[in-house]
Amino acid sequence: MIPSDHFVRFYNEIFKFLENKGHEHLEDYFLTISRHQETHCLKQFSEGGLQGMYDYWMVIKKEENCDSDKFIEDGQYGKVLKSFMSGCPSLGKVQDNDAGACPLYCYHCPGWILPIMSKVGYYYVYDLISLDMPRCQATICEHIEDARAQLKMVLNRHKGDRSLVKWNFPEED
């Protein structure tokens, strides 16, 4: 088995290669990752809902040594799972080498997660914060109105810069 230090650096080089061929190649790769991830989490997410998602990511937190906090709370319309990553080990490892990070490295997380959230019927707002800091925030909502309120807040924080925010639902009906 390849050590995670090598894996994330290899991933990074694949991302750079594909982006160099054209952004659509990188997007297609993220969708391929998403399809493969379904075997690991689709059933748990669809049957366990937000608690199943929380349980899945708590295992990942331990396995990957993530500096993150997650909690489920009440939104205005339904339950919401919030995630705050204050130390992403994956991006940290990619930055800690002389090859340089793919400028879009962080996009792989929403790239695989958003399609799965759509399949299980949850609304996802992913705030990348900055592409060169190993930090991000995510909110997963049962109800679209909670997600729209979160999206509005995140877009306001980024002064309308949509490049650092990813979501899987229409902003308006």
Locations of the language-model features?
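ATP phosphate-binding glycine-rich loop and adjacent ATP-lid/helix-beta elements
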Residues: 108-109, 113
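N-terminal accessory segment detector
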Residues: 1-107, 118, 123-173
